Amino acid sequence: MPAESIPDVCLKDEVARSEHPVLIIDGMNLFVRCYCAYPAVSSHGYQLGGMLGFIKTLTRLSNDLVPRGIVIAWEGGGSQRRRALYPDYKMNRRPEKLNRFYQDDIPDSDENRLHQNVALIKLLKHVPVWQVYADCCEGDDIIAHIVNCQLVNRNVIIGSSDKDMHQLLNARVRQYSFHKKRVLTADDVYAEYGILAENFGIAKAVCGDPTDNVPGVPRIGFKTLTKHIPLLRCEATVLDDVLKYAASHRQSSLPCARIWADEQLVRRNWELVKLDISSLPAARSAQITSVLSADAPALDIVGVCQILADEGTSNLNVSELTTTFARYAGCRIM
């Protein structure tokens, strides 16, 4: 499978009105996707698809989306707050598997994946991008913090296939889906789900999220929800208003009665699915501000080549990488 290919339609036309948005990459989301799908083996016989696929995808996105700068947001160990609230949170996740194997070996060990992730982070330190993470926070929470607290005056494109990002979309924030290979807007979320993007988190709190092992109200899906609680598709709202609406209509609507009866489940789910910027410690927030306020570092192509040599690969177009990323050296996003 090639690196995340961009469809023939020119994405530059889609993002033209953004006037060079900041591109924020959900680092682990893209890395795991490339790790599972991209076939690349080093001269040492080890898998390198995660690292090489990530760099090639980042290069392609940079050329097609033409951002003013690139931020990579990494997982910081997951959310202790969510696990304390619901111990089964994300416990259904299976280890990532390669979708291919060579001879009789299936080289999908955690050790190899971790090695690639560390090597990728080291390589990116030689590239004009900003890398950020926060202890005990998930990557999407960090992205929400950057979008809503750090880059409040910037247009943003979030690179992620995670539907949780839908709740961040508005006039200045869009999402590039690695899965759909296109830029998504708040209007696209409404067209697909019949729900305003800013209400997407509330809808997930009611319907649940099987991906994260979060159970919803029984027999309530998105279509049923929007039919019986129309305010989700009409206006930006808050969870309390949705629950009040369900309570006031429980006699005439069985779905509303179910939501009303499961109020505590819905409230717990809301704490699980909302992108929480309040859990970020002040010291870590200040550190992220410091990182994003700095000029982008210079491109150290010698350092990049050294890491590639150490990993036993020359499977990157260094000339293209230089042309793509040299323009970001010294740029600012804050």
What are these regions (language model features)?
Residues P2-D8, K12-E19, R60, D64-W74, ...:
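Non-catalytic nucleic-acid-binding/docking modules located in mid-to-C-terminal regions
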Residues P2-V9, D13-G159, M165-V183, K274, ...:
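Noncatalytic, basic helical substrate-engagement surface that gates or grips nucleic-acid strands
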